[in-house]
Amino acid sequence: MLDGRRSNSILPTSLSPNSLTTPPFFFHGGHGTTVPDNLYLLLPLTSAILYAIGSLGLRAAAQEGVSPWRSIFMANVISAAAFQIYLRGWPTPEVPAEWLPVLGLGLLFFCGNILTVLSLTYGDVSIATPVLAAKVVIVVAMLAVLGDGNVTGTTWVAGGLTVAGVGLLQIQGKNHPRHHHVLLTILLSLAASTCFAGFDIGVQSLSARHGFHRVAPYAILTAAVLSLALLPLCNMRYREIPTKAKRFIWIGAGLVTLQATLLIYSLGTFQDAAGINIVYGSRGLWGIFMVWAIGKHFGNRELQTNRGVFKFRIAGALCIVTAIGLVFM
């Protein structure tokens, strides 16, 4: 259900949304801080905003000639370092109770990154973006198949509104080039969405059984190790990257890391993959807003001023805001 009450038997009592404890760097008040109702959904909302800004940095770096493979490598390595804060028992931290599933989650995360870049590089961005947003519906469908009691009719409606909203936000003007590689774009984007959906549900399920600290840090570390294979694909060495591009890539990778830390933490701790993904789906809306608000600082001139495009973006924004409202109700 979406009102904060949980009936799922795999959820430990200590993780009940009405008595959740969170680290003081997320919510002030120290140990034992309670999180009322659906306040935890502010975490994926923050992640969506940070992702929108971070993506501007990564796109600006790409415009300066930085390979997207370099961006993936840096983001995954920085994320692996950041996730070490969740480990317990230093200097000999607790290890996963089940190594194979955790390594599998790392592989899913890595493959999702690769497929996303391929869909955006070799496909049509205006098609890839809304299809990638279908991750919301895939997560809801997977949870329904697995018998998660939190999936309701409202969840399905909110998920559908999110995908529709992202699709409307991506509609281009009349002068936009015709779509190309449509089937390839859809297949790559769906594959990426499925990988990330599997990762989200896996983190939620394994964290409920073994603890977030024994799952996510090792899964992200696995993705970082796999990312070493991307270095030969980079078009230049790090020291050859222009100073301006380095600034953009560090801003982008840093913010993408921070948003991933918040998002994955919320998935593993609050056990609401459907609601969290619906709220996180607002990143498309925030992306449009950030291009308008600060895009010029990143050399971004994407935003169309065509009235026909503007009305579709207003409709898309309303869909996403409605979806978020349904989740918070």
Pin down the residues of each PLM region:
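Loop-to-transmembrane-helix transition segments
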Residues: 39-47, 74, 84-115, 183-194, ...
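Transmembrane alpha-helices of multi-pass small-molecule transport proteins
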Residues: 46-58, 63-111, 161-164, 215-238, ...
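Hydrophobic/small/kink-forming positions within alpha-helical transmembrane segments
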Residues: 52, 106, 110, 137-141, ...
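Membrane-interface helix-cap regions at the ends of transmembrane helices
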Residues: 79-97, 141-145, 167-177, 204-205, ...
